[in-house]
């Protein structure tokens, strides 16, 4: 399982939002490419993380 998240660390404040859950890395990366518009400065990012359900 892959999780797409938006991360922000600005002015010593950390925020994050889960944007989606995907069955494959390829699907997550496709959604990540569309979500890049949410990144407005160097303190922000979108990323896919692998999650092991076991």
Language model segments and positions:
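Short amphipathic alpha-helices within nucleic acid-binding modules
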Residues: 24-32
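Short, surface-exposed coil-to-beta transition loops
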Residues: 1, 14-17
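A short beta-strand micro-motif
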Residues: 1-8
């Amino acid at each position: 399982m892959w999780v797409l998240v938006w991360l922000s660390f600005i002015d010593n404040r950390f925020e994050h939002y889960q944007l989606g859950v995907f069955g494959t890395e390829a699907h997550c990366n496709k959604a990540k490419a569309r979500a890049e518009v949410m990144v407005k400065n160097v303190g922000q990012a979108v990323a896919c993380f692998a999650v092991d359900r076991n």
